UniProtKB/Swiss-Prot annotation:
Pfam families named in the record: TAP42 (PF04177)
Superkingdom classification of source: Eukaryota
GO molecular function, one term: protein phosphatase 2A binding
Region described as Disordered: 185-214, 271-294
Gene3D superfamilies: TAP42-like family (1.25.40.540)
Family the entry assigns: Belongs to the IGBP1/TAP42 family.
InterPro entries xrefs: TAP42/TAP46-like_sf (IPR038511), TAP46-like (IPR007304)
UniProt GO cellular component terms: cytoplasm; cytosol; nucleus
Biological processes annotated in GO: regulation of dephosphorylation; regulation of TORC1 signaling
Protein name per UniProt: Uncharacterized protein C63.05
Length: 323
């Protein structure tokens, strides 16, 4: 099979580039085509750093664009290893600028800006120059009667536009490479380190505190309830949630700490209540205050009234949830 010439490879690749297809397969074919062209250029030794741009044949000026076209195509790739793609593009952009510099094809505004205002001014100037070059290139491409002089001017203009575009693209590529490297380093660091990030640790600690503030841990060393679910020892549940709930849905008063029977028994022990056994009832007295004639139920009712008078609502024990 006869191998294709450099001109044939170039034209086939240019047709693919100008086609409406933008899928990854087509892009790969375009890159492959330009890489074959570049390989042939090196083999044929078409260019030399010792010659001037005027010494290059008009028909061969287009091949100075190969590195630029490779960089431009790969820069637009979105799938696969993005860092590898932008590094590839950066390498070919810089190679293109180096070749153009060797042949004296330098940017129109070559001075370096000193301030931010100078940078903005330079960008505006380059943008306007590029617009003028593109208009000139468009006019040259429409001319049906193209001679060698016009063709040469066409390719030199296209090279100048590519130089300006490269100078605009390189800062963005360098910034993207820096961001991608940082992201890659952070990813490797997180994969290598078993430690969790600070935000995750704070979130888990907060959840643990919220859970432990109201849950009763049944796995403690000492048992709390017996087989009949009766408490073996006093315990208190301290809870921010319960405190809040009590303030919102609470009784509005503090609950008593003992029953009426317990209160009466305690008063009897203290001697504040006279037992019927110690003082038999008198048969000739119908006084309502004679305790000896009152049965146990009446006595409890009276002392319950006394208890309520002595302990108004809201004056009892403030500790709740005791078991």
């Amino acid at each position: 099979m006869e191998s294709k010439s450099l001109r044939e490879l170039w034209e086939e690749t240019e047709k693919l580039k100008d086609s409406s297809s933008t899928d990854e397969k087509t892009r790969s074919e375009i890159v492959e085509g330009y890489e074959k062209c570049l390989k042939l250029v090196l083999q044929l030794r078409i260019f030399s750093s010792n010659e001037e741009v005027d010494e290059i044949k008009t028909s061969e000026l287009r091949y100075l664009m190969i590195d630029y076209e490779l960089a431009k195509c790969v820069e637009q790739w979105t799938k696969g290893d993005r860092l590898k793609a932008v590094q590839y593009a950066k390498t070919h952009y810089e190679t293109f600028l180096s070749i153009c510099d060797d042949y004296g094809l330098k940017p129109m505004q070559d001075e370096k800006p000193k301030t931010e205002a100078d940078t903005r001014t330079l960008k505006i100037a380059r943008y306007r120059m590029r617009q003028n070059l593109e208009k000139e290139l468009k006019a040259l491409s429409k001319d049906s009667e193209t001679n060698e002089e016009q063709e040469r001017k066409f390719w030199l203009t296209k090279l100048q536009i590519a130089v300006e575009d490269t100078l605009d693209s390189l800062p963005h590529i360098e910034m993207e490479i820096d961001l991608l490297k940082r992201a890659q380093a952070e990813l490797m660091k997180s994969e290598d380190s078993p430690e969790k990030d600070e935000e995750t640790l704070r979130r888990e600690e907060r959840k643990q505190k919220e859970g432990s503030s109201w849950r009763l841990d049944l796995n403690t060393r000492d048992k709390i309830l017996d087989k009949n679910n009766r408490p073996l020892q006093p315990f208190t549940i301290v809870s921010d949630r319960n405190e809040t709930r009590k303030n919102v849905f609470g009784f509005g008063y503090n609950l008593p700490t003992m029953t009426v029977d317990e209160y009466l028994d305690e008063e009897m022990k203290r001697g504040n209540i006279i037992s019927q056994k110690d003082n038999p009832p008198k048969s000739d007295s119908d006084d309502e205050d004679d305790y000896e004639k009152l049965d146990a139920k009446t006595m409890k009712d009276r002392y319950w009234d006394e208890f309520k008078e002595a302990n108004p609502r809201g004056s009892g024990n403030t500790m709740v949830n005791r078991g």
